[in-house]
Regions:
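A short glycine-rich, Lys/Arg-flanked "PGG" loop and its adjoining helix->strand segment in the class I
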Residues: 215-227
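Short hydrophobic/aromatic beta-strand or adjacent loop that forms the aromatic wall/cage
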Residues: 250-254
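Conserved beta-strand signature within the Rossmann-like core of class I S-adenosyl-L-methionine
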Residues: 228-235
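Conserved SAM-binding loop of SAM-dependent methyltransferases across substrates and taxa
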Residues: 107-122
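Extended basic-aromatic, gly/pro-enriched interface segments that bind polyanionic ligands
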Residues: 126-201, 205-213, 238-240, 258
C-alpha cells in the first residue's frame, strides 16, 4: 500500500507527539505539501524519513506548523481593553498577586507585553507569567529576549524606553521583566494544563484546530482557570458555544469563567 498523508500523520505523531488529525485537514495538508515541495521533496514518505535524520529540517517543520506570527502589542485596541478593563477586574478579583498563562507564546512578544502592562499596576515580584509553546526554536528566542525594531513598532514608547536597552541593531528586554516569565515547552493538544490560573491569553492559535479539538482546548482552559478567571482570545476568534463550555463574554475577545 502506498505511503499517504494518513501514514505521514501517524509517523509525525510518533516522532513529535503532534497529532495532525486535530488540525483542520484540508488547510494543514495544503500547508505541509507547500513546505515539502519548497524543501525539495516530492512525497510524504521521503519528507518524513528526511526529517527523522535531520534535526534542523524537523525543527523547521514544527516551527512551520505552529505558524509563529507575533509582535509586541499586536492589535493595540485589545491591549487597551486589557489594561483599562481587565487589569482592574483582575485586581479586584484576586488582589495583588497574579498567575497568568500565555499559551502558544511564540517568540515571547505576548508574555512580555502582558508583564510590562501589569508592571504599571503590580510589584514585579507579584507577577507570575507562565509562557508555553510547542516549538523549541521560538522558546529559545523568547528566553534570550532580543528583538528587532520591527517587532516593537506597535509597543508604546514609554514601555520601550523603560523596559528595553538598545543593543546593536535591536533591543534587549531588561532582566527584571524576564524574571517574571517562566518559559516552558507545552503541547496544547496533548499535555497536562497548569492550574490556579487567573488569566489565560491564547490568541489566533485554535483557529487551525478542528472544532472538536478547539472545544476541548477551551474546556481545559476553563479547568485551568480559577473561579471568575479570564480567557483572552484573538481578533479572528469567537467562542460560539461559550455558555456550554463554561464562559460568558465580558468584552470583545474576553471571556470569564462562570
Amino acid at each position: 500500500m502506498a505511503y499517504d498523508y494518513e501514514n505521514f500523520k501517524k509517523d509525525v505523531n510518533a516522532l513529535t507527539n503532534i497529532n495532525l488529525s486535530l488540525y483542520k485537514e484540508r488547510q494543514m495538508k495544503r500547508r505541509i505539501e507547500s513546505l515539502m515541495v519548497r524543501k525539495g521533496y516530492n512525497n510524504f514518505e521521503d519528507y518524513f524519513h528526511a526529517m527523522k535524520k535531520d534535526e534542523e529540517l524537523l525543527q523547521g517543520f514544527v516551527g512551520y506548523l505552529t505558524i509563529n506570527v507575533s509582535e509586541f502589542y499586536r492589535n493595540p485596541t485589545q491591549w487597551e481593553v486589557f489594561e483599562n478593563t481587565m487589569i482592574p477586574l483582575l485586581k479586584k478579583q484576586y488582589g495583588s498577586r497574579l498567575n497568568i498563562w500565555s499559551a502558544a507564546c511564540s517568540t515571547g512578544d505576548e508574555p512580555y507585553t502582558i508583564t510590562m502592562l501589569l508592571a504599571k499596576y503590580f510589584p514585579l515580584d507579584h507577577i507570575k507569567v507562565i509562557a508555553t509553546d510547542i516549538d523549541d526554536v521560538v522558546l529559545g528566542i523568547a528566553k534570550e529576549g532580543f528583538y528587532s525594531k520591527r517587532s516593537l513598532d506597535r509597543l508604546p514608547k514609554e514601555l520601550l524606553d523603560k523596559h528595553f536597552e538598545k543593543k546593536g541593531n535591536g533591543y534587549q528586554i531588561k532582566d527584571d521583566i524576564k524574571a517574571c516569565v517562566d518559559f516552558r515547552k507545552h503541547n496544547l493538544l496533548e499535555d497536562t494544563y497548569p492550574t490556579g490560573i487567573h488569566m489565560i491569553i491564547c490568541r489566533n492559535v485554535v483557529i487551525y484546530f478542528t472544532d472538536e479539538a478547539k472545544d476541548e482546548v477551551y474546556r481545559k482552559f476553563n479547568r485551568s482557570l480559577e473561579k471568575n478567571g479570564i480567557l483572552f482570545i484573538g481578533s479572528t476568534e469567537q467562542i460560539i458555544h461559550a455558555k456550554e463550555l463554561g464562559y460568558e463574554a465580558t468584552d470583545s475577545f474576553f471571556y470569564q469563567k462562570v
